[in-house]
Amino acid sequence: MSGSKSPKGEFAGRKIVLKRKESRWHHYKYVNKALKLKEKSDPLGGAPMGRGIVVEKVGLEAKQPNSAIRKCVKVQLIKNGRVVTAFAPGNHAINFIDEHDEVVIEGIGGPSGQAKGDIPGVRFRVVMVGKNSMRELVRGRQEKVRR
């Protein structure tokens, strides 16, 4: 006689709850959430944005079938010293960013916090340069302060 593995009966509640708790650990999303692996591996440490200093400007080739050089910057984060690559969005946006500038970066919005579109391995984008919004600089509504 084949029966189900789940206990049945009037007093089976505790056993069912314990079994469910145990089974959760076989699901990778639950494990990542329970052990806070996202915060541990994320360069921003779970924060929505982070400040950093521009180390160098780089041009990355787009993935096939596109053909372009995507303008990016390498940024050293202030909070933990990690170096990440961030995309500079907008026409001629790279011209507003100089080495040793302080920038604010955020996630680029790819699937599961990963790279987006045809830019390989880039998970962040530049939001602000100094105190100026990147979007406003590109549109010409703000000028970058020269020291």
UniProtKB/Swiss-Prot annotation:
Q: Which PROSITE patterns match?
A: RIBOSOMAL_S12
Superkingdom in the source lineage: Archaea
Manganese among keywords: no
One annotated GO biological process: translation
List the transmembrane segments.
Answer: none
Q: What SUPFAM superfamilies does its record include?
A: Nucleic acid-binding proteins
Q: Which cysteine pairs make disulfide bonds? A: none
Q: Which UniProt keywords apply?
A: Ribonucleoprotein, Ribosomal protein, RNA-binding, rRNA-binding
Gene Ontology cellular component? small ribosomal subunit
Q: Which InterPro entries match?
A: NA-bd_OB-fold, Ribosomal_uS12, Ribosomal_uS12_arc, Ribosomal_uS12_euk/arc
The entry lists its GO molecular-function terms as: rRNA binding; structural constituent of ribosome
- Quick check: keyword rRNA-binding in the entry? yes
Q: Which Pfam families match?
A: Ribosom_S12_S23
> Gene3D superfamilies annotated for this entry?
Nucleic acid-binding proteins
Per the similarity annotation, which family is this?
Answer: Belongs to the universal ribosomal protein uS12 family.
Q: What does this protein do?
A: With S4 and S5 plays an important role in translational accuracy. Located at the interface of the 30S and 50S subunits.
Q: How does it assemble?
A: Part of the 30S ribosomal subunit.
Q: What is this protein called?
A: Small ribosomal subunit protein uS12
Q: What is the lineage of its organism?
A: Archaea, Methanobacteriati, Methanobacteriota, Methanomada group, Methanococci
